[in-house]
Amino acid sequence: MSLKEKTQSLFANAFGYPATHTIQAPGRVNLIGEHTDYNDGFVLPCAIDYQTVISCAPRDDRKVRVMAADYENQLDEFSLDAPIVAHESYQWANYVRGVVKHLQLRNNNFGGVDMVISGNVPQGAGLSSSASLEVAVGTVLQQLYHLPLDGAQIALNGQEAENQFVGCNCGIMDQLISALGKKDHALLIDCRSLGTKAVSMPKGVAVVIINSNFKRTLVGSEYNTRREQCETGARFFQQPALRDVTIEEFNAVAHELDPIVAKRVRHILTENARTVEAASALEQGDLKRMGELMAESHASMRDDFEITVPQIDTLVEIVKAVIGDKGGVRMTGGGFGGCIVALIPEELVPAVQQAVAEQYEAKTGIKETFYVCKPSQGAGQC
């Protein structure tokens, strides 16, 4: 049963009438451009064919009822006329409440709604299950009440909800690609202007995501430390963000910086340049160059930004040994575990899967999870 059928059926059973709309918003994987988003830089993600799906209908009062199919059909209910505060026990409900609360601040021309939510974006894997939920909820209200909001505004609203209501710092990339993704394309995003450029993906190339299943523990504290180090670097150059520093400017005075901060800055500057070049390589179908850029990105994350772990490095090495210069592979996401992403000619996917199955668990004691994805369309009706 599809997520659409599942949520529609649950909706009718729970609320006693049929849903009028079903909305989806996808998860994402970032092909290249890591930790560049909060430095006002460039990222190159694509939406994937794993999504959050919401069957919904408008109400003729000011009540919001939300059922979470993936959390034992837990039900949350709140009013649009009372201050929206955090739910005491359902963390999932706070993403919904946060989106609705921040949407009221942007455009309050909407009424009540009934929703049933389900999704298949793997949680805790760094594939943006939370952003896809935020964008899905925003899109539900936009569609049901014909709100004059575009995808970028729905994305910004989701980011605000996550930062301010849920209390988790994040850049804009995850929500933006979920809202604006394009089938068979990646999206080059300028995280300062929020300008986007669709970049066509080469035919016959699979987007493979492999979850190391290494439990991330440091991700919150270390993420914040990296942000602070980047801000320290920007202040040293008297610039609002590292986006505004050139590699030549950095090289001239790198020796004056704290050595750790210098390494962090070097990663951001070189990663930004790699990301812009990667968009061109993909457009030209130059998988060899794309693979080189992904390898450089991984080395930079490992050695300069220091956000990889041995399990992730092992996975990358296993995949690289199979694909050689016919594709690319690197860690993706915040770091300290999580996933790797690989662009692999479709005919090599079985060999990669076999090599990983034979070697990764033997070397690390952990069993991986393997996803073959398609670059997919952003949020909308399904």
Swiss-Prot record:
What is the enzyme's main class? transferase
Principal subcellular localization: cytoplasm
Residues that, per the record, bind ATP: 124-130
Annotated GO molecular function terms are: ATP binding; galactokinase activity; magnesium ion binding
Q: Which GO terms describe its cellular component?
A: cytosol
Pathway given for this chain reads: Carbohydrate metabolism; galactose metabolism
Keywords for the protein's UniProt record, in alphabetical order = ATP-binding, Carbohydrate metabolism, Cytoplasm, Galactose metabolism, Kinase, Magnesium, Metal-binding, Nucleotide-binding, Transferase
Q: Which E.C. number(s) belong to this protein?
A: 2.7.1.6
Positions annotated to bind substrate: 34-37, 223
The compartments listed are:
Cytoplasm
Q: Which residues bind Mg(2+)?
A: 130, 162
The entry assigns this protein to a family as follows:
Belongs to the GHMP kinase family. GalK subfamily.
Instruction: Provide the function of this protein.
Output: Catalyzes the transfer of the gamma-phosphate of ATP to D-galactose to form alpha-D-galactose-1-phosphate (Gal-1-P).
What is the protein name for this chain? Galactokinase
What is the organism of origin for this protein? Escherichia coli (strain SMS-3-5 / SECEC)
Q: What high-level taxonomic lineage is stated for the organism?
A: Bacteria, Pseudomonadati, Pseudomonadota, Gammaproteobacteria, Enterobacterales
Gene symbol of the encoding locus: galK
